[in-house]
From Swiss-Prot:
Presence of the UniProt keyword Iron in the record: no
GO BP terms: phosphate ion transport; response to symbiotic fungus
Top-level taxon: Eukaryota
Species the sequence originates in: Petunia hybrida (Petunia)
Catalytic activity: phosphate(in) + H(+)(in) = phosphate(out) + H(+)(out)
Signal sequence segment: none
Extracellular side of membrane: 77-111, 156-165
GO cellular component terms attached to this protein's record: plasma membrane
Membrane topology: Multi-pass membrane protein
Cytoplasmic side: 1-55, 133-134, 187-189
InterPro entries: MFS_trans_sf (IPR036259)
Name of the featured protein: Low affinity inorganic phosphate transporter 2
TM stretches of this protein: 56-76, 112-132, 135-155, 166-186
Length: 189
């Protein structure tokens, strides 16, 4: 990023040129300001120092804890999709199929979820990231993932009924959509 190029690599000219390309305007590099910041002793501290913890500890803890919670929810959904699809009756139990049929039906269900939710979530992020902004997209994604996960989890028995399968799949897909049109925005941008 331009911020890294200017503040860490100490190359204000390159940072200004990079941002000029992105914003389609000419930006004057502030070499003097970058040099002044580089010489400032208050900006010189180690990664494992109390100054680092004082300046960045709360943000780092907040970021790590939310990503940890997201990863538990997101990767659990991916790992246990087969069990979820079987529980709601979207695919038959494993004992009723041979191994090839089971793999085919699980792969088909996972592909449908990916094509109808995860991939569109990515493209929505690409389309709207410069309009809405990363931060707003991430907040919205975290919020709606939480809403849809609670909407699935709290009345779980409701979703296991035959007549509610389509609704479950839609809600389940929306959690994956908002994973990519949300927290994962910084992963692939």
């Amino acid at each position: 990023t331009a911020r890294y190029t200017a503040l860490v690599a100490k190359d204000a000219k390159r940072a200004a040129a990079d941002m000029g390309k992105v914003l389609h305007v000419e930006i004057d590099p502030e070499d003097a300001k970058v040099e002044r910041m580089a010489k400032d002793e208050s900006n010189q501290f180690g990664l494992f120092s109390w100054e680092f913890v004082r300046r960045h500890g709360l943000h780092l803890f907040g970021t790590c804890s939310t990503w940890f919670l997201l990863d538990i929810a997101f990767y659990s959904q991916n790992l246990f999709q087969k069990d979820v699809f079987t529980a709601i009756g979207w695919i038959p139990p494993a004992k009723t199929m041979n191994a090839v049929q089971e793999v085919y039906k699980i792969a088909r269900a996972q592909t449908l979820i990916a094509l109808c939710s995860t991939v569109p979530g990515y493209w929505f992020t690409v389309a709207f990231i410069d309009i809405i902004g990363r931060f707003a997209i991430q907040l919205m994604g975290f919020f709606f993932m939480t809403v849809f996960m609670f909407a699935i989890a709290i009345p779980y028995h409701h979703w296991t009924l035959q007549e509610n399968r389509i609704g479950f799949v839609i809600m389940y897909s929306l959690t994956f959509f908002f994973a990519n049109f949300g927290p994962n925005a910084t992963t692939f941008v």
